[in-house]
C-alpha cells in the first residue's frame, strides 16, 4: 500500500476510529529540502511539537505545536502550524459550556489563520476530535491562499480514517491539495498509537533526489478515557 495522495503530500493528517471503535488521529510530516527534513517530533506532556534537529535555527513555519490533547474532555487537535492551540481551546470551551460542536468553528479559525506566507502559499490544514451528544465527532479543514477555508465532517466508521493534505502529490511540482476531488480514506492497520503512526510512516516512503522525504509521524488513540500518543521519527 502507498500513500493515497501520492509521493509528496507535504504534511498530512487523518482522523477517525480504530477497528476497536476508539477515536484516533495520525499526522505525517515530509520535506523535500534539507532544512525541512532536519526536524523531529517531540512529545511534551499533552502536546507534540515539530522541532529542529541539533542546532538548526528556529523557523516558525517549520517548528510548531502539531498536536494537543486533553484526557478530561477526550479532545485532541492536530494541525500543521500556529492554529493548533486556537482550535484546541475553542472546542474545549464548547465542550465545557455544553455547546454542540460543529465544523463551522474550525472553518472560521482556519480562515483567520490564512495560508502560510511562503513562496508556495502553503495551505494550512487542521483537525479536531471531540464529542457531540455523547458520541465522538471529528472535523477536518484546509485553508488555501486562493479560496476560502473549507471544513468537513468525518464519517466515524470503525477501522477507517479520513484525511487531508497540504499538497496534491507530485514531487517536482507540488500544488495545493484540492478537496473537490474527495478526501482520501485509509483502512487502519493496528489499533494502538504506535501501530497507526508506523503504518502511515511506512506507506509514505518516497525519495527526492535520493533522499527519504519522511520526517515523522504522530499517532494518537483515545482508550479508556486517556490519549495514548506515539511518535515515529526518521532521525
What are these regions (language model features)?
Residues 1-235:
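Conserved short alpha-helical segments that host acidic/polar catalytic motifs at enzyme active sites
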Amino acid at each position: 500500500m502507498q500513500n493515497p495522495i501520492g509521493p509528496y503530500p507535504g504534511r498530512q493528517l487523518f482522523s477517525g476510529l480504530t477497528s476497536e471503535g476508539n477515536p484516533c488521529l495520525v499526522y505525517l510530516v515530509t520535506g523535500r529540502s534539507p532544512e525541512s527534513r532536519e526536524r523531529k517530533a517531540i512529545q511534551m506532556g499533552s502536546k507534540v511539537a515539530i522541532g529542529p534537529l541539533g542546532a538548526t535555527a528556529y523557523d516558525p513555519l517549520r517548528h510548531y505545536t502539531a498536536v494537543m490533547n486533553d484526557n478530561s474532555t477526550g479532545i485532541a487537535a492536530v494541525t500543521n502550524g500556529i492554529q493548533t492551540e486556537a482550535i484546541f481551546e475553542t472546542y474545549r470551551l464548547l465542550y465545557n459550556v455544553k455547546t454542540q460542536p460543529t465544523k463551522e468553528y474550525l472553518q472560521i479559525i482556519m480562515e483567520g489563520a490564512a495560508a502560510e506566507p511562503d513562496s508556495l502559499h502553503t495551505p494550512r490544514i487542521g483537525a479536531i476530535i471531540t464529542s457531540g451528544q455523547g458520541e465522538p465527532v471529528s472535523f477536518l479543514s484546509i485553508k488555501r491562499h486562493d479560496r476560502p477555508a473549507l471544513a468537513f465532517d468525518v464519517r466515524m466508521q470503525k477501522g477507517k480514517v479520513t484525511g487531508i493534505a497540504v499538497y496534491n502529490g507530485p514531487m517536482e511540482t507540488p500544488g495545493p491539495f484540492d478537496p473537490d476531488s474527495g478526501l482520501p480514506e485509509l483502512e487502519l492497520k493496528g489499533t494502538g498509537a504506535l501501530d497507526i503512526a508506523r503504518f502511515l510512516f511506512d506507506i509514505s516512503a518516497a525519495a527526492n533526489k535520493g533522499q527519504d522525504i519522511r520526517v515523522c509521524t504522530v499517532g494518537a488513540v483515545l482508550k479508556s478515557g486517556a490519549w495514548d500518543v506515539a511518535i515515529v521519527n526518521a532521525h
